């Protein structure tokens, strides 16, 4: 195919996909066929009298990887429901443009004569018979979603007709028998030789949103400017409430710098929903990764809103970081950069929160042409970069650190030992001081003071006895007194008080009397206390 033809075909494919999204009317049917059958797909609409030629597009979306498809009830605008099919976008192959043409009349006939394909060549197995688009010699590869879009100028509203076609391999017919009859259904569609399931089996339960809020966000992905220009974003946010519960919607703008050393910026979508992940906080490809932001550039808040009063009709407020040239573009959720410079450029991400949860997001790169970097969306989390280890292995202690409870017990034991030692020293000091005072008191005793040396010979308290009338006793004689002693008092305690000099038996005065009885020197140790060398003092 020539390059201009390829370009035209690419435009037609994009135009056909857009038609599938923006169609005004949708009609969906299901057909089953066997390989080699002729399948009547669409009945071409009649031309409008006096209307410009309509544009017709026939495309095929292969769905061989989607498994078995069946009808289901889908809630597009609750509580209304339509019978349709829910298909995972990941299993749908690239659309194939089968034909596209403008209607034209032959001899004033109201039946359109199609002008096949961009190069005027009709498809090999497609044909229009009596106003019906027919697929001849169906194959297993023709299974999928066939879409016929008819655009009527001048407003280019499209009517879409969708047929889910399932082509099964033909089974060999039994020998010697007649094949089962084929019933024409839906305009003569031929059924396979074997009985096929009904075109409308029992629909499954609802699979679309029936509660909550669905948010649709559309934006361009790049804005180029020259220094000094005034530019603004073009983001469209459309919330659809599926119930009457109130909700709060926040449109948050964040900005990431685009370093010159980065070949491209990577946006990790899981980090928008789970910013607390360790790999999001420390990505391996930082600073070329847009994973977690620390501050919000601008926020516009709507709420409380409801299905009857959606944004922007519900109450709203806005907040924005103070930056030169940054402002809101009117009363919308878009940003405006006045007198933009290279410092104003960067990766801008718009995130829509509903009741604190992420519901939609988009991004746009605002930059000059010389510093433009592409942004790539990654569906998986980034690789984790461990934080650097600050201390070196040699600086770490070799042995294990003692546990805190063991250290506390050791401190307690040492404290108790010190306390016992202090108490013992205190007791020892007190005893030593007491003994020293007692010894000093004995050393200071005056030997000349009166001292008791012996008991009296008379009966103690003799004046109170029955013999108290007698003046003298047989024991009161001068011969019984020690030399140098005074006679004992007649009516006293019975003790003899001696002077210091006289009381000493070994003194010179006592030795003058020959009848003094003394103890031998070798016997004195038996009668004296060795621990008390001095005589007892006066009581």
From Swiss-Prot:
List every stretch annotated Acidic: 468-480
Q: Where in the cell is it found?
A: Virion membrane; Host cell membrane; Host cell junction; Host Golgi apparatus membrane
Q: Which residues form the signal peptide?
A: 1-24
* UniProt entry keywords in alphabetical sequence: Disulfide bond, Glycoprotein, Host cell junction, Host cell membrane, Host endosome, Host Golgi apparatus, Host membrane, Membrane, Signal, Transmembrane, Transmembrane helix, Viral envelope protein, Virion
Could you give one GO CC term from the UniProt record?
Answer: membrane
Q: Does the keyword Transmembrane apply?
A: yes
Could you give the subunit structure recorded for this chain?
Answer: Interacts with gI.
Summarizing the function annotation, the protein's role is: In epithelial cells, the heterodimer gE/gI is required for the cell-to-cell spread of the virus, by sorting nascent virions to cell junctions. Once the virus reaches the cell junctions, virus particles can spread to adjacent cells extremely rapidly through interactions with cellular receptors that accumulate at these junctions. Implicated in basolateral spread in polarized cells. In neuronal cells, gE/gI is essential for the anterograde spread of the infection throughout the host nervous system.
Give the protein name, as stated in the record: Envelope glycoprotein E
């Amino acid at each position: 195919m020539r390059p201009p033809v390829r370009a035209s075909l690419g435009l037609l494919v994009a135009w056909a996909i857009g038609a599938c999204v923006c169609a005004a009317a949708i009609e969906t049917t299901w057909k089953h066929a066997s390989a080699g059958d002729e399948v009547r797909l669409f009945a071409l609409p009649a031309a409008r009298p006096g209307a410009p030629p309509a544009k017709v597009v026939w495309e095929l979306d292969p769905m061989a990887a989607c498994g078995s498809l069946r009808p289901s009830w889908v809630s597009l605008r609750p509580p209304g429901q339509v019978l349709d099919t829910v298909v995972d976008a990941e299993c749908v192959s690239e659309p194939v443009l089968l034909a596209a043409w403008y209607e034209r009349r032959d001899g004033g006939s109201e039946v359109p004569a199609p002008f096949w394909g961009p190069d005027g060549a009709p498809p090999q197995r497609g044909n229009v018979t009596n106003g019906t688009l027919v697929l001849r010699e169906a194959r297993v590869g023709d299974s999928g979603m066939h879409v016929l879009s008819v655009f009527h100028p001048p407003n280019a509203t499209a009517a879409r007709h969708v047929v889910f076609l399932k082509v099964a391999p033909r089974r060999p017919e039994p020998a010697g028998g007649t094949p089962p009859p084929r019933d024409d259904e839906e305009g003569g569609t031929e059924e396979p030789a074997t009985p096929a399931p009904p075109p409308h089996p029992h629909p499954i339960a609802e699979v679309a949103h029936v509660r909550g809020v669905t948010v649709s966000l559309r934006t361009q992905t790049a804005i180029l400017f020259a220094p000094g220009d005034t530019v603004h974003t073009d983001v469209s946010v459309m919330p659809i409430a599926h119930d009457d519960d109130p909700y709060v919607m926040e449109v948050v703008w964040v900005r990431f710098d685009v370093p010159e050393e980065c070949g491209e910026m990577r946006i990790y979508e899981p980090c928008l929903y789970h910013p607390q992940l360790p790999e999001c906080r420390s990505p391996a490809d930082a600073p070329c990764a847009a994973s977690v932001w620390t501050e919000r550039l601008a926020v516009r808040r709507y709420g409380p809103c409801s299905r009857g009063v959606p944004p922007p009709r519900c109450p709203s407020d806005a907040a924005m970081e103070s930056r030169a040239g940054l402002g809101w573009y009117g009363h919308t959720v878009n940003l405006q950069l006045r007198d933009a410079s290279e410092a104003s450029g960067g990766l801008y991400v718009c995130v829509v929160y509903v009741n604190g949860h992420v519901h939609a997001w988009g991004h746009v790169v605002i930059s000059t042409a010389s510093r433009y970097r592409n942004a790539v969306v990654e569906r998986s989390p980034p690789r984790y970069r461990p934080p650097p280890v600050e201390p070196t292995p040699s600086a770490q202690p070799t042995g294990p650190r003692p546990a805190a409870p063991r250290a506390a017990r050791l401190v307690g034991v040492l404290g108790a030992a010190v306390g016992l030692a202090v108490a013992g020293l205190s007791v020892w000091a007190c005893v030593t001081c007491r003994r020293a005072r007692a010894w000093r008191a004995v050393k200071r005793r005056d030997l000349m003071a009166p001292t008791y040396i012996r008991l009296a010979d008379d009966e103690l308290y003799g004046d109170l006895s029955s013999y108290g009338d007698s003046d003298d006793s047989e024991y009161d004689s001068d011969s019984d007194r020690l030399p140098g002693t005074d006679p004992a008092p007649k009516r006293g305690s019975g003790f003899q008080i001696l002077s210091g000099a006289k009381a000493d038996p070994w003194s010179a005065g006592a030795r003058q009397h020959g009848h003094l009885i003394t103890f031998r020197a070798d016997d004195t140790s038996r009668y004296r206390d060795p621990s008390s060398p001095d005589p007892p003092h006066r009581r």
